[in-house]
Amino acid sequence: MKHRKGRVEGEILRELTKIIRKNIRDPRVSNVTFTAVECSNDFSYATVYYSLLTEDEQAQKEAEAGLEKAKGTMRHLLGQSLTMYKVPELIFKRDQSVIYGSKIDRLLADLKKQEQDRQN
């Protein structure tokens, strides 16, 4: 059953990526990238993780509002492309791993610079 769940999650991720690029014209979601999908065991809910190219708080709120507005359209189009008995309800959550990774990169770059300054 886990293997099927993984396949379905991957298919939902691919289809949602296509949908947001081709069918959703809202400029608030133009910088949104879907990173992962986690489905409930009965496939009634799908948590969709997304990231943004910016760390601007206002842009994040606008993107969240744009995704919430487009949720119904995305679910409808997802239902047309998937062969499932029931299309899962979409729940959007911000993926914090991208922000965390960039902070780690900055810290490592700072440490490297400090090390080079000590050697000189």
UniProtKB/Swiss-Prot annotation:
Keyword Cytoplasm on entry: yes
Keywords: Cytoplasm, Ribosome biogenesis
GO annotation, cellular component aspect: cytosol
Gene3D superfamilies, sorted: 3.30.300.20
Record SUPFAM superfamilies: Ribosome-binding factor A, RbfA (SSF89919)
GO BP, one annotated term: maturation of SSU-rRNA
Pfam families in alphabetical order: RBFA
Compartments where located: Cytoplasm
Domain of life: Bacteria
Major localization class: cytoplasm
GO molecular function: ribosomal small subunit binding
Keyword Cytoplasm: yes
Family: Belongs to the RbfA family.
Known role: One of several proteins that assist in the late maturation steps of the functional core of the 30S ribosomal subunit. Associates with free 30S ribosomal subunits (but not with 30S subunits that are part of 70S ribosomes or polysomes). Required for efficient processing of 16S rRNA. May interact with the 5'-terminal helix region of 16S rRNA.
Subunit structure: Monomer. Binds 30S ribosomal subunits, but not 50S ribosomal subunits or 70S ribosomes.
Protein name: Ribosome-binding factor A
Source species: Lactobacillus delbrueckii subsp. bulgaricus (strain ATCC 11842 / DSM 20081 / BCRC 10696 / JCM 1002 / NBRC 13953 / NCIMB 11778 / NCTC 12712 / WDCM 00102 / Lb 14)
Originating gene: rbfA
